[in-house]
């Protein structure tokens, strides 16, 4: 059972030019992460958790931490879930987080300053990826710049799985980092592996894309070569090799699923 205390959220009272920041966190069975994620976002005026019918203590921990929790079925569409969150707050500025991410103090201070100045811009932030306790510097993990902080009325999300924020505002770099604890257990890794490869195959199938068996055979070795050699995964040691091999398997799995989906048509 989780227990602990949380710092109070930032007090905006008394400011003449009040600009509210909302932090949006999508969750599904994230009891191991949600507490630390919310603690890192204590600079915000509001923290909103959009929960996909978690079966663990995610909702209870989030509510105890001071977040507003809304249950809303994901239905395999991450972009739609993020766009739904836009309708659930009146905040002027939005920061989107994943439950396994943490905001550095420097980034939080920068966002408070930006919200007070209220420029017409969107902000990308550097993400530091940590897999199984190891900070990842190569293998496609850097540079990892995420467009996450922007005025509420200036963004829409697109994409079923690896969704992207779309905005017409100029994009600037935000000082500070997000720390992304991307994988903490192999069970969690393979849960996401299966979920994401299925969703990506479904998205491509729905878009009318096809896959030859030659692609099933040839793309995985190239995916490994790109990750391990071209992107420097070899410099990450044993974990770099393991993740490179699984990256190839990930590539194969999504194309195998697409191949057999189209075979049923």
List where the protein language model places each region.
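Short beta-strand/loop segment that forms part of the nucleotide-sugar
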Residues: 25, 44-53, 70, 98-99
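Cell-envelope/extracellular polymer assembly enzymes that use nucleotide-activated donors
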Residues: 20-22
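Short, well-formed alpha-helical segments that are part of the catalytic scaffolds
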Residues: 24-43
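Conserved donor nucleotide-binding strand/loop of the catalytic core
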Residues: 59-88
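Catalytic-site signature of metal-activated, phosphate-bearing donor transferases
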Residues: 79-86, 93, 104-265
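A conserved acidic beta->alpha catalytic loop
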Residues: 40, 51-61, 74, 98
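Acidic helix N-cap motif at the loop->helix transition within catalytic regions
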Residues: 33-35, 56-65, 106-107
